[in-house]
């Protein structure tokens, strides 16, 4: 990506988070906020920016919309250092010795709201990390950051070229693959008392044939109502908390 500057003096490599609460949290956490852009008055943001010695610049609403590619910025945008990505090996360093790691593998997930929500739940249950593809999938964006409510900075994420090969490598290290599909066995029939790679598929296509063939288990969520399926983030959230409940019962 090029380094040309725009009228605000930013380079094309600039990355943003937006929304009053998200920006406030980043400032309170002393995250690496480079600059704040505002089209509204917010005393808390202004106070925190002064405290952290972060430059604040007044711009109009249209400029913020152009910067973030959305009109849901609430008049407050922070320019931040690029979101950190980890290697798979770095993610594995966080696995405890009791054999109860949980990695969420996302197969060409496209909706940033789904990714953000999955990161938020992954943080809540203490997941080991999240892995997604470098291409044909959503990455770490401003929308993902906002929806994640800060989890984008706390959950270790890896972006890989080949999910199938990555899964094979994990299985060689003792991880078990649990795929998701409407035709799978009831998710409650699996104990999850092993290092688990939980695979969540694309919003429309589900998980790919290659990944499904490599799965040790394929599970589904029972649907007793009239709706046939659940949103990817909702399904992932139910499964993540179910695994947590099985591993850490009261």
Regions found by a protein language model. Give the residues of each.
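Short, acidic/turn-prone active-site loops that include or flank metal/cofactor-
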Residues: 41, 61-64, 135-137, 203-205, ...
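N-terminal positively charged helical leader segments and presequences
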Residues: 1-93
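RNA substrate-binding interface of SAM-dependent RNA methyltransferases
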Residues: 28, 38, 54, 93-185
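Active-site helix-initiating loop/hinge in glycosyltransferases
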Residues: 19, 107, 114, 229-231
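Structured adenosyl-cofactor binding patch, chiefly the S-adenosyl-L-methionine
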Residues: 24, 29-30, 124, 146-149, ...
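Short basic, glycine-rich beta-strand/loop surfaces that mediate nucleic-acid
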Residues: 67-82, 148-152, 193-201
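Active-site/ligand-binding-proximal alpha/beta "capping" segment
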Residues: 178-227, 231
């Amino acid at each position: 990506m090029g380094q040309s500057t725009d009228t605000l003096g930013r380079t094309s490599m600039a990355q943003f988070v937006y929304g009053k609460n998200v920006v406030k949290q980043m400032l309170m956490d002393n995250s690496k906020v480079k600059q704040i852009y505002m089209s509204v008055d917010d005393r808390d943001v202004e106070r925190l920016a002064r405290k952290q010695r972060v430059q604040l610049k007044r711009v109009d609403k249209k400029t913020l919309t152009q910067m973030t590619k959305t009109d849901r910025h609430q008049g407050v945008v922070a320019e931040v250092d690029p979101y950190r990505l980890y290697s798979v090996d770095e993610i594995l360093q966080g696995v405890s010795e009791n054999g109860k790691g949980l990695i969420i593998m996302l197969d060409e997930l496209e909706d940033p709201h789904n990714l953000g929500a999955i990161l938020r739940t992954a943080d809540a249950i203490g997941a080991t990390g999240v892995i997604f593809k470098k291409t044909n999938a959503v990455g770490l964006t401003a929308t993902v950051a906002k929806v994640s409510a800060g989890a984008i900075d706390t959950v270790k994420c890896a972006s890989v070229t080949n999910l199938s090969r990555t899964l094979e490598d994990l299985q060689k290290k003792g991880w078990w693959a649990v795929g998701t599909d409407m035709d799978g066995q009831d998710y409650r029939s699996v104990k999850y008392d092993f290092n688990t790679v939980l695979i969540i598929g694309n919003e429309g296509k589900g998980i790919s044939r290659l990944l499904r063939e490599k799965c040790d288990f394929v599970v589904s969520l029972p649907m007793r109502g009239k709706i046939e399926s659940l949103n990817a983030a909702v399904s992932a959230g139910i499964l993540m908390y179910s695994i947590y409940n099985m591993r850490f019962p009261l």
